[in-house]
């Protein structure tokens, strides 16, 4: 008897356009002229450089160490010379620059000394977690949360189910589909490694029904220890909370994490990266990227991290046109960028070239309620929009802004052509900056009070000595 499936609220059935790329074998992208490696390609604290300008580095060598627990190292994705350490354009909705390490490839692609780990089943989960951390592995299907943090949470809590997420629901994107078709053994082995690392009772690999070839590739290798499920196509079913609801019927409470209900989820790409890290000693230095849209030869590429976006587009016959838009990610959740020299990073799953977008001007909200109907997080997007525009952060918290998964369903159905998700992202950034500033001020005050108390104590001790 098959697993009972459940429906998640809201969502959309929209054209997927995956046929542009999913049937073509992936290509290995040739070396670019420069590799640009941001120090922060993940949620958490940026890594700190351990090299200097002029140093020679090899492929797989650590060039920036993790700083703190929620952080991962950055590795050279090819051999060459460090030509700069400075601020460069990085994938960001607001066009910001961030610290990066720039490598001038020498063309030799020489590996650093890397060491595979012994049979994963013979080592303890904590050691396996550390191997995955040192490999710089983060979630490859979402915001880039450091994988070892999720794994550690798993060993500190009882994990009933590990979900390996292959539900690639965003239109145009087929990089996970190609990865599974071409390297199914990586997915299966990686899933078993992660299961061992979190000591999960059950393991499920979930795909969507428009991935029959990927399903068949996994089915040939799978045993009874892993359950393989194909789900009806619906957007955004690949969202963490939505997929948990569909597979288990459970809901992750607002402000809570999947681990709080006994579930850990990782992307298929993360599973494959774990396999390579453990069995080969290879850090995360490349990934599959879909390059699609208005291109002569759209397809999936295997790309070294740090490769400029323009270099990827060029492999697919890109020719710059007036009025076009470049999106990193898909059309629903992706970010519009103007600088094609920014690099592919650990979380880059797609480069999408589109004709002129947002041809119709934004109009006032008519409070039609369509956005409410399609919101998979059961929020009130029109209220979030109103309070985001007025920067009413207190009301945004009341309306659970941070439960928004930025899926873009609300923007898609909005008859007023309002880029709702853009407003939500901006508000989230402002709130986090405000909270960071408040923490800094509180820390400064604590230091001032402590220093004042110390000086007063020392002055009192000096007076006491004089009196004695």
Indicate residue ranges for each PLM-predicted region.
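Ferredoxin-type iron-sulfur electron-transfer modules in oxidoreductases and energy-metabolism complexes
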Residues: 348-362, 372, 376-455
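Conserved hydrophobic positions within beta-strands
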Residues: 80-82
């Amino acid at each position: 008897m098959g697993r009972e499936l459940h429906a998640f609220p809201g969502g959309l059935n929209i054209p997927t356009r995956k046929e542009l790329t999913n049937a073509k074998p992936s290509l290995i992208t040739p070396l670019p002229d420069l590799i640009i490696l941001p120090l922060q390609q993940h949620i958490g604290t940026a890594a700190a450089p351990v090299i200097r300008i002029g140093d020679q580095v090899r492929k797989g060598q650590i060039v920036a160490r993790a700083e703190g627990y929620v952080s991962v190292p950055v590795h050279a994705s090819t051999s060459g010379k460090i030509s700069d350490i400075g601020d460069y354009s990085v994938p960001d909705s607001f066009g910001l620059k961030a610290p990066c390490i720039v490598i001038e490839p020498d063309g030799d692609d020489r590996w650093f000394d890397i060491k595979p780990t012994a049979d994963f089943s013979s080592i303890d989960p904590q050691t396996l977690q550390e191997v995955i951390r040192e490999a710089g592995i983060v979630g490859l299907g979402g915001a880039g949360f450091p994988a070892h943090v999720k794994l550690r949470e798993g060993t500190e809590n009882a994990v009933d189910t590990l979900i390996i997420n292959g539900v690639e629901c965003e239109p145009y994107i087929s990089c996970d589909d190609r990865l599974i078709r071409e390297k199914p053994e990586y997915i299966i082995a990686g899933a078993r490694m992660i299961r061992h690392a979190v000591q999960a009772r059950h393991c499920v690999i979930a795909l969507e029904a428009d991935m029959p070839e990927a399903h068949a590739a996994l089915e040939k290798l799978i045993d009874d220890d892993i359950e393989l499920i194909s789900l009806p196509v619906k957007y955004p079913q690949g969202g963490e909370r939505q997929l948990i609801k569909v597979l288990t019927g459970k809901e992750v409470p607002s402000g809570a994490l999947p681990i709080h209900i006994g579930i850990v989820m990782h992307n298929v790409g993360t599973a494959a990266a774990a396999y390579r890290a453990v069995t080969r000693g290879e850090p995360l230095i490349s990934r599959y990227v879909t390059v699609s849209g208005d291109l002569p030869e759209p397809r999936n590429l295997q790309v070294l991290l740090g490769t400029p976006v323009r270099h990827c587009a060029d492999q697919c016959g890109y020719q710059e046109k007036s009025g076009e838009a470049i999106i990193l990610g898909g059309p629903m959740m992706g970010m519009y960028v103007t600088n094609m020299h920014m690099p592919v990073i650990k979380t880059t799953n797609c480069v999408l070239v589109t004709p002129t977008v947002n041809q119709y001007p934004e109009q006032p909200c008519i409070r039609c309620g369509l956005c409410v109907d399609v919101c998979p997080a059961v929020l009130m997007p029109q209220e979030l929009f109103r309070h985001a525009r007025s920067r009413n952060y207190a009301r945004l918290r009341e309306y659970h802004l941070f439960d928004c998964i930025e899926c873009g369903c609300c923007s898609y159905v909005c008859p007023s052509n309002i880029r709702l998700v853009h407003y939500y992202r901006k508000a989230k950034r402002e709130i986090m900056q405000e909270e960071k500033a408040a923490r800094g001020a509180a820390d400064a005050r604590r230091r001032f009070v402590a220093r004042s108390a110390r000086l007063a104590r020392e002055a009192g001790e000096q007076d006491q000595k004089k009196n004695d």
